[in-house]
């Protein structure tokens, strides 16, 4: 566990400045807000056309992901700025403030990764089992799955309030999170369980993305043989619309880069918890703070990944690549676009 110098610190170290926190807060608000505007414009554009089930579900999941990131930023970042303004650590405001901040950080890290997992699973199921997907999966599933994920994440992150796990303050006094190096076995079990859940989600997302790549390659091979635009399921024409391969590539690219960001932001925390469990319990404020910073910037980077990988940007890249391909394969036809 953290020693008294950080765990019960009353004032913020003067060497730390609120500028990075303020920049992160502004970038998170602006980025997530802009991403929501782009999503709404696409939704209205899509409403003018015949809807596609998989696009509607994907749109809802991505919107939920962006809204969750925005909410997490709004609920956590202002507390840090207030702490800097009063030069008072979270624990010295009130212990409940530290517990609230720890819950917020833990909850939004878990729910965001869970939503990305659901999005990757949606693409995996859509391409791997298109007939079943078209018959049984609709956007209504999102209104069932998303609340269930929120309920599970909430209950799990409330456990430290019932003495299974604990939220503690980290240097410089503006961070609270689960105790990554606890002495009590029940608190250590909770930290390991949290890290394991995060690791399993990340690995599962990577596997799903690999499966989607495999299915896209098979679609590409079939298209080369047939010489026509690929469809997800020809035998279910009454239930399915034509879906260009470019649309699936766009979805894959978005999920892939978001997964990379999550891996980079999550692994330091997972490694830190496991090292504390297997090591000699020596604390390292620098490593703890590094892990917390990585996990916190995820909600800031996510919307910018979405913005930079909007269809117009992706199409520009894809058609640029296609111009360099041979005329025999005519890859430009492969990327016939249908807006999300």
Please tell me what each predicted stretch does:
Residues 264, 270-274, 289-336, 340:
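Seventh transmembrane helix
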Residues 2-10, 87-106, 155-200:
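Loop architecture of class A 7-transmembrane GPCRs
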Residues 29-43, 66, 73-80, 107-131, ...:
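Cytoplasm-facing ends of alpha-helical transmembrane segments in multi-pass membrane proteins
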Residues 21, 25, 38-40, 71-88, ...:
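Helix-to-loop junction signature of class
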Residues 111-118, 125, 131-175, 200-207:
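Fourth transmembrane helix
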Residues 48-68, 214-269:
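Intracellular effector-coupling site of seven-transmembrane GPCRs
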